[in-house]
Amino acid sequence: MANSTSSGSRAPALSGAGPVMIIGGAEDKLRDRVILARFVQLAGGRDGHVVVVSTASSLGDEATGLYRELFLHLGVGRVSGLRPVTRDEANDPAAGRLMDTATGVFMTGGNQLRLASVVGGTELGAALLRAHERGAVIAGTSAGASAVSTHMMAFGASGASPKHRMAQISAGLGILTNVVVDQHFEQRTRLGRLLSVVSQSPSLIGLGLDEDTAAVIFANQTLEVIGRGAVTIVDGSEIVTDSYQTKGHRPMMVSGAILHSLPGGYRFDLKSRTLLAGPAEAIGKVPRAVETARRRLHRLSREIAAEGADSFVVDRKDRKARELPEASE
């Protein structure tokens, strides 16, 4: 289940809660791919140890191998892979010990229900929380991003208008406690279901992540956007709704929701729910040496994204190209 590219078991010298990077899936499509490079930077670069958790995907072993190759090319000193597929495997003490040496954790896409149901409440799940608390960066892409929060978007329908029973919430991994995360946001028209969840739980902040776009959330609750798309933030603190009266799958009345759409470089204070003045400084270009690995990763990320697509949201072109299995992302 666990493997690594180098030896060593000493816990890294970190302090304080680490950053959390949530990615909207299909990351780094453009030539200057900055999201994974930023993750590597936050994980410590040459001095870092990244653990790739690929439980969410049925392509897990292949995904682990490609991410390992990419992260090594980007300069990480050590990359390990974990892919428990049962709760017994996730309770293996060896998995927890490996996680205890990580400076960065990267959870792949696929099916967030698989990830949360296998890892949540196990030794590996506890080790993941410990890693975050001692300063490791925790990242998830697509399904891995949704699973990061305590309240997880398990599955739901597409559409711009909020409707009753449009989305299902279940328990996630508990790293972020005050948000609910949705991914492939613009590409799969998921505004409606995020609005419906926030209207029913207005204490939560809704975060909708476009593809090839990430939000980095730091310990001080500052959120920074990177990538080519946007992060949609839904603040329900002043919301008015009839969601408790709506029946069936009928449209809900939602008024007073505060929406922010932030492209790369902008920052947001999740504590005060306000935009911070001035965009953040962009990270530099990624070396050309990783181009081949990134192209291979991009092809695989599209397969993983397709694997996790809601069956009723699949694009017509994708339907013609291949038969897609059901998943809950």
Each model region followed by its residue ranges:
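Loop/turn elements at helix/coil->beta-strand transitions in domains of secreted/extracellular proteins
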Residues: 47-48, 77, 101-103, 134-135, ...
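General beta-strand structural signal in soluble alpha/beta enzymes
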Residues: 22, 80-82, 106-107, 138-141, ...
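C-terminal and late-domain segments of enzyme folds
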Residues: 2-46, 52, 58-73, 152-154, ...
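Catalytic nucleophile loop
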Residues: 107-109, 128-152
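Portal/gating segments that form or line small-molecule/metal binding sites
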Residues: 51, 57-101, 107
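Short gly/pro/ser/thr-enriched loop/turn and capping motifs at secondary-structure boundaries
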Residues: 113-114, 145-148, 232-233
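Catalytic-core regions built around general acid/base machinery
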Residues: 97-101, 121-135
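Glycine/threonine-rich flexible loop motifs
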Residues: 112-122
